[in-house]
Amino acid sequence: MAGNKRVRDAESEQDHAETETVVKDTATTGEVEGSFSDLKLSDGTMKAIGKMGFTQMTAVQTRTIPPLLAGKDVLGAAKTGSGKTLAFLIPAIEMLHSLKFKPRNGTGVIVITPTRELALQIFGVARELMEFHSQTFGIVIGGANRRQEADKLMKGVNILIATPGRLLDHLQNTKGFIFKNLKALVIDEADRILEIGFEDEMRQIIKILPNEDRQSMLFSATQTTKVEDLARISLRPGPLFINVDSEKDTSTADGLEQGYVVCESDKRFLLLFSFLKRNQKKKVIVFLSSCNSVKYYAELLNYIDLPVLELHGKQKQQKRTNTFFEFCNAERGILVCTDVAARGLDIPAVDWIIQFDPPDDPRDYIHRVGRTARGTKGKGKSLMFLTPTELGFLRYLKAAKVPLNEYEFPTNKIANVQAQLEKLIKSNYYLHQIAKDGYRSYLQAYASHSLKTVYQIDKLDLAKVAKSYGFPVPPKVNITIGASGKTPATKKRRTKD
């Protein structure tokens, strides 16, 4: 990457909520801390861990696995990419093994996670870990075939990975689903589960599940009041609070090189196109703020012979799953996506995270960049696009302990394909329509940002934004701004469609 680099320090304190009933055990390093062979695990688990290529534990595994093996409840705070999936699966599998769980005993462990992709990923890790065990495992997620799931549950699934909505559905409606013998409950990405609106479902699930002699573990990248409330109703009194991040200098992975570029709206796509062209041999994830923007830019880039994959919430589950695994297995390539891919997904060897549309807040930023530099020795780079009016976001990142460099790209290295882009959008009816949808959705997403002091829609230059979607003049679109549903006259754009 060319250009000057001005290092900006980003250090400040980050508070973690504490409750009186919680025992503190704080590790201050994310370095490798111990060996799996020290844990005295079953032969089947050790064989699987060896086959997966792991010998040393990460900090969160070192701190978490021994108390979980001893039967304690754990409330874990660890940044994304810290290795927590193994930290909760290994003790769960060991418990099922020691209790000699059979299919007829029903479900002994339930893992609840916010998204279908994350559930599939945890399921994949569980499948590898259980290769040499006799216990059964399964997954229930929205969008999958409910009847097939019910059939498997009735045959007996010892360890079940689930999203909240579908799990509640089966708990309430699937006769023959045996969960009375539940021994452990894992709630992963608890803050995200609550953020996306599953608070009521979680309360109902916890009410239905047996809690006598049940071990519980709750993991959350951030500790909020709602997470504390969920911990209070799901964990036994006096859980062990394990925080491997509280005294670290940064909130992001150590092997992550992070930067931002200041770019006017009309030059954003040209810079992105130039960057992707030069990095076609790398593995890159590009984040956008809306499904329609993803659809447009993915279609456009593929049309102009820059092959990309797309992942967003409007796709059918099978398509999302196929795309996710295709990108996982690729040595290089570009994935254009919404935040559906930002949380917890473990995609191997990602070189670059590009935040083309800005994240809503520092937490979203941290989870987006968490797709690279994963594990103990992970390396990766991230680049965030900001317009001159959005630079206030850097203050929030600094307060969240995110270290950033500023990158400058020489203008002579940026491909000037604006005229060709506008000509293409004008002549291709389909691209014209999805460009218009993308433009409208970008404005709508911008208007709904929570950091109103940073992302001010009145300060957007619509003519420049339109150019990044291939329009010489802003198209007429209709968006709703603000809680009142009223659209300021200066921003009102009516459309006939």
Swiss-Prot record:
SMART domains for this protein: DEXDc (SM00487), DUF4217 (SM01178), HELICc (SM00490)
Motif (Bipartite nuclear localization signal): 267-283
Binding site for ATP: 78-85
Keywords: ATP-binding, Helicase, Hydrolase, Nucleotide-binding, Nucleus, Ribosome biogenesis, RNA-binding, rRNA processing
Residue span, Helicase C-terminal domain: 255-425
Catalyzed reactions per annotation: ATP + H2O = ADP + phosphate + H(+)
Class of the enzyme per the UniProt entry, highest EC level: hydrolase
An example Gene Ontology molecular-function term: RNA helicase activity
Superkingdom as given in the UniProt entry: Eukaryota
Residue span of motif DEAD box: 188-191
Gene3D superfamilies cross-referenced by the UniProt entry: P-loop containing nucleotide triphosphate hydrolases
CC per GO annotation: nucleolus
One Pfam assignment: CTE_SPB4
PANTHER family: RNA HELICASE (PTHR24031)
Biological role stated in the UniProt entry: ATP-dependent RNA helicase involved in 40S ribosomal subunit biogenesis. Required for the processing and cleavage of 35S pre-rRNA at sites A0, A1, and A2, leading to mature 18S rRNA.
Subunit: Associates in the nucleolus with the 60S and pre-60S ribosomal subunits.
Protein family: Belongs to the DEAD box helicase family. DDX18/HAS1 subfamily.
Name this protein carries in UniProt: ATP-dependent RNA helicase HAS1
Species name: Kluyveromyces lactis (strain ATCC 8585 / CBS 2359 / DSM 70799 / NBRC 1267 / NRRL Y-1140 / WM37) (Yeast)
UniProt lineage: Eukaryota, Fungi, Dikarya, Ascomycota, Saccharomycotina
Gene (name only): HAS1
